[in-house]
Design a protein with these regions (language model features):
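Short helix-coil junctions and helix-kink-helix linkers
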Residues: 183-192
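NUDIX/MutT-family hydrolases
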Residues: 110, 121-158, 171-179, 197-207, ...
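Long, intrinsically disordered, low-complexity Ser/Thr/Pro-rich regulatory/activation regions
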Residues: 210-245
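Short Pro/Gly-enriched beta-strand edge/turn motifs at strand-loop
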Residues: 2-8
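N-terminal strand-loop-strand
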Residues: 8-54, 69
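Core subunits and conserved enzymes of cellular information-processing
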Residues: 1, 28-42, 69-80, 223, ...
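Short, His- and charge-rich active-site/binding loops that engage polyanionic ligands
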Residues: 35, 39, 43-46, 50-52, ...
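Active-site segment of metal-dependent pyrophosphate-handling enzymes
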Residues: 17-19, 35, 62, 68-73, ...
Length: 245
């Protein structure tokens, strides 16, 4: 094949869909006793759905050979300034009518961040505002496209996975109290947990390190601080350990 033929662009004989990514970024605020679980949202500065809230995301740079994970990291950073380590693919959304501009297929990802690292998120690119919004108040706002459906599925995935994997530690400060850990689980699972049972179970796993210092609380005595021992957890998993709560 000649070099000219190799460089020639291939043209399909049928219409092609646009490929996009969406980044559902969860954060946790232990200082918010009412609405501690947050989601990172942007307000759309352009149509369609101008002025509506939306999940950060956008088109994959096909021409630059960009991968899906690279695309979602780039889009979230461009639109909010946030970066993250934990990332997992949620689902592919391809309803023919999900975008009024044409056929758009979106691959959605869940990301977890320590909210304290990104308190001052700023809207950028085609977003005029970025905010941490309480998950339990999403029903009060207008969301663009099929993003309400996407967020609902993302929350269900988070609720399911936190029961058998230690992903919650990607949302907590690196040093945390058992009270903050229980607060996180209750916020995600959306139900109260028995304090004594929760602490007994979590401490029996042997994956927490008591660091020897204490945190001052709003009321009551200072609480012990802990860290998650990831290496010990990974070693325990190799031996058949089950994190299930």
């Amino acid at each position: 094949m000649s070099s000219k033929a190799e460089k020639r662009k291939y043209t399909y004989d049928w219409p092609m869909a646009a490929l996009t990514v969406d980044g559902i970024v969860f954060g946790f605020d232990p200082n918010d006793d009412i609405n501690p679980l947050k989601i990172l949202l942007i307000r759309r500065a352009e149509g369609p759905f101008i002025g509506h809230w939306a999940i950060p995301g956008g088109h994959v740079n096909i021409g630059q050979n960009e991968g899906l994970e690279d695309a979602v990291r780039r889009e979230v950073q461009e639109e909010t300034g946030a970066r993250f380590e934990y990332l997992e693919q949620l689902y592919t959304f391809g309803d023919p009518n999900r975008d009024p501009r044409g056929r758009v297929i979106s691959v959605a990802y869940i990301a977890l961040v320590r909210k304290a690292d990104y308190e001052a998120v700023v809207g950028g690119d085609d977003a005029d505002l970025a905010v941490w919004y309480p998950v339990n108040k999403l029903g009060q706002i207008k969301l663009a496209f099929d993003h309400r459906k996407i967020l609902s599925l993302a929350l269900k995935r988070l609720q399911g996975k936190i029961r058998y994997a230690p992903i919650g530690f990607d949302l907590l400060p690196s040093k945390f109290t058992l009270g903050q850990l229980q607060q996180l689980y209750e916020a995600i699972l959306q139900r109260d947990l028995v304090k004594s049972n929760f602490r007994r179970r979590i401490l029996s796993m042997g994956t927490l390190i008591e660091i020897g210092s204490k945190a001052k609380l709003k009321s009551g005595r200072p609480a012990k601080l802990y860290q998650f021992d990831k290496k010990k957890y990974e070693k325990a998993v190799e031996l058949g350990f089950n994190f299930e709560l």
